[in-house]
Amino acid sequence: MKPELKKLLVLNLPYLLFVYLFAKCGQAYRLAAGADASAKLLHLTNGISAAFASPLPSLHPFDLCVGVAGAVAVRLIVYSKGKNAKKYRKGEEYGSARWGTAKDIAPYIDPKFENNILLTQTERLTMTGRPKDPKTARNKNVLVIGGSGSGKTRFYVKPNLMQCFPTSDYPTSFVVTDPKGTLVLETGQMFQRAGYRVKILNTINFSKSMKYNPFVYIHSEKDVLKLVNTLIANTKGEGEKLAEDFWVKSERLFYTALIGYIWYEAPAEEMNFTTLLEMINASEAREDDPDFQSPVDLMFERLEQKDPDHFAVRQYKKFLLSAGKTRSSILISCGARLAPFDIREVRELMEDDEMELDTIGDEKTVLFLIMSDTDTTFNFILAMLQSQLINLLCDRADDKYGGRLPVHVRLILDEFANIGQIPNFDKLIATIRSREISASIILQSQSQLKAIYKDAAEIISDNCDSVLFLSGRGKNAKEISDALGKETIDSFNTSENRGSQTSHGLNYQKLGKALMSEDEIAIMDGGRCILQLRGVRPFFSEKFDITKHPHYKYLADADKKNTFEVDRFLSTLRRKRQQVVAQDESFDLYEIGLSDEDAAAE
């Protein structure tokens, strides 16, 4: 039976009783003695006794007509009353907002502690993307908002880094930004104990960093374009226009041509930014001599002879359409944009690669991205790395693992506003969930997100099913207060009228009040936070106490002996790498024969 038909029958079944009762009334009227209606009414009692003498329904046409008519009349009355019924929501007249309870969050928590994302002291979110009940499925993207000193690192970043349990059912890699360079010192040893590979990119002190070469991760012409887009997006001057002008588009063509040439034609050891810089330095255009050819022009001319349809050649020919004077200006712009690479340490950092970004989703790894929280000069390197990382992992999930990485990758992006702009991040964050990748975006204010991503900021925040508010005021507090909604409260007023006679009055009424007003949020206790999980009532809870975590004893916070020695780690790593290279080195063996004189001397 169809559900709609079944529902219709169930709703109308009670009316069969009314058909029976009204049919009996019709039978009583028919059996009552009398020639007319008034006479029958006088003897109706006898008719009722006769009608109900047998419990069986009457099948007389008159009785059936009365029964059906009576039931229809009752149905019409019920319909009319329902149509005009007043809608009351007692206790919710002005709003139904309330704080969530343990019962509300229970369906979203994994019974096994290590299988969860830690949000507050009492609220957690399971790492599984496919729970038994599909309606409780939530993405693992978290938006964390908290002003300076609110404990973003202590109450969110560290607790979640401590979830590196070897016994977890959901193995996880971490990519974490480290604005002060302290996280790697405090947690590095813990990760080594848990069997993690440790990777470090340090843009504050390049001598304490592993090497990162973006060219290693270029596998197609699309990757060339992505690298150029990221480079341009994160090396804008303070006053540069948002919309690309002619000069920026021309630079884009030039970079694409050069990087395409390097990727296709250069030997592996020369595939880096140093080669790109040398090619830019060797480029020259003369206004008074249109036939002049620089060494780079000659390189592309030879490449065109070999392959006229070469990707790099096509880009370079478009660049050459501009006049000599224009090209000179473009070359100056390119030199200015890549000025940071004139620093020897930066070039050395990016000449080789030790990151192995494409394997982070294959085995448990922690990658620390150390950046300055006061200077953004080299943050474009971090933006390039993260852009490449996300694209690499998505491609690897699709091409090798059927759409899902074997190791979940969590991007814990502290001071997200200082990282730089990741191209198409609003689109990436909406699609990474299915590849076993999640992002925790940590900000001091949501306005920081809007300043970088403009209209896309709202899309990014909407793709975070969890919002954790640690502290804030002003616009942040107002937005959170509005999102929490209103509750209905009871209020009473007393009045007193004084005159020849004194009278008193008492008036009760319902009012709507914000669950937590803007001023209440501004003065919120420093140990409390607000959690909003999509589809669940908000929670007003204690921030997570890291001293209660089983792995706290492995942090440098608990014991200074646990401090991670970066210099020692890097020197050991490079010594092992040199040994591997030495073992793999090949040598040519020559047999040298002795002359007759030398043989006689022997």
Where are these regions (language model features)?
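Basic- and hydrophobic-enriched, low-structure N-terminal and domain-boundary segments
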Residues: 1-150, 154-162, 167-169, 497-498, ...
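N-terminal short leaders/motifs
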Residues: 113-130, 307-325, 472-473, 481, ...
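Short, charged N-terminal helix-start/capping segments
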Residues: 4, 60-117, 293-318, 338-370, ...
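Conserved long hydrophobic alpha-helices within structured protein cores
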Residues: 113, 119, 380-388, 480-483
